[in-house]
Amino acid sequence: MAHQCACFHFFLCGFICYLVHSALAANSSSTLCFWFPLAHGNTSFELTINYTICMPCLTSQAARQRLEPGRNMWCRIGHDRCEERDHDELLMSIPSGYDNLKLEGYYAWLAFLSFSYAAQFHPELFGIGNVSRVFVDKRHQFICAEHGGLNSTLSTEHNISALYAVYYHHQIDGGNWFHLEWLRPLFSSWLVLNISWFLRRSPVSPVSRRIYQILRPTRPRLPVSWSFRTSIVPGLTRPQQRKVKFPPESRPNAVKPSVFPNTSR
């Protein structure tokens, strides 16, 4: 009897452990993070974008119909005309997680919005899938995306910019160019922010100081004030005359004016 109870408890504990392990495995997720310096703020909102998913109409019938009310010069691939309902909405939620009321700089906003869009709608760009949420680690200034895959297919041997370029041009050929225009600011703003962060914290070298001194604008010259006494230097306003040497005993005395001319006006 005791042996049966021990076996029952053993199988019961094993079953409970299996359920817990399955639940943890189902909820397990990996995190992909990007470091964006100078990213602070406290806001959460949703961004909705209306965009057409139609290609330009190329047929003569569509060219005539585009002038009619309710028609458009853009039509779906394989169709000869475009209706008013031939559009789509892109709904993107902007995550919260900031403690200030602003993002410091336009590039921080641009990078934040671009990464949020790319992680939610094009996670394959980063070698991930099934992105559950995008959040911010304000302590380390990380913008992260939680995804369901345990391993990322993004090879560490390749540059993310090169992978982006290949993926971008491949998607352009596939007809998704209107989606991926949002991905350009991600890498440009990321580069600008990191370069700015590096330049702010790097010591000033003598070369940079010299360039600054050369390129520093000069002060504008102030108007000359004539309210002080001036003396006329002989020889500046009169033509130069030949010098005559006098003997020491016959040297003429220089006459000094007793009163200087008033030039305060």
Swiss-Prot record:
Q: What does the record say about its membrane topology? A: Single-pass type I membrane protein
Annotated stretches, region: Disordered: 241-265
Task: Indicate whether Secreted appears among the record's keywords.
Answer: yes
Gene Ontology CC terms: extracellular region; host cell endoplasmic reticulum membrane; host cell Golgi membrane; membrane; viral envelope; virion membrane
Instruction: Spell out the subcellular localization from the entry.
Output: Virion membrane; Host endoplasmic reticulum membrane; Host Golgi apparatus membrane; Secreted
Glycosylation: residue positions: 27, 42, 50, 130, 151, 159, 194, 262
Q: What is its main location?
A: virion
Please list every transmembrane segment annotated in the UniProt record, as residue ranges. 6-26
- Signal sequence segment: none
Which InterPro entries does the record associate with it? Arteri_GP3
Superkingdom is Viruses
**Keywords noted in UniProt:** Glycoprotein, Host endoplasmic reticulum, Host Golgi apparatus, Host membrane, Membrane, Secreted, Transmembrane, Transmembrane helix, Viral envelope protein, Virion
Protein family per UniProt: Belongs to the arteriviridae GP3 protein family.
Q: How does it assemble?
A: Heterotrimer of GP2a, GP3, and GP4. The GP2a-GP3-GP4 complex associates with the E protein.
Described purpose of this protein according to its UniProt entry:
Minor envelope protein.
Protein known as? Glycoprotein 3
**Per UniProt, what is the name of the gene that codes for the protein in this document?**
GP3
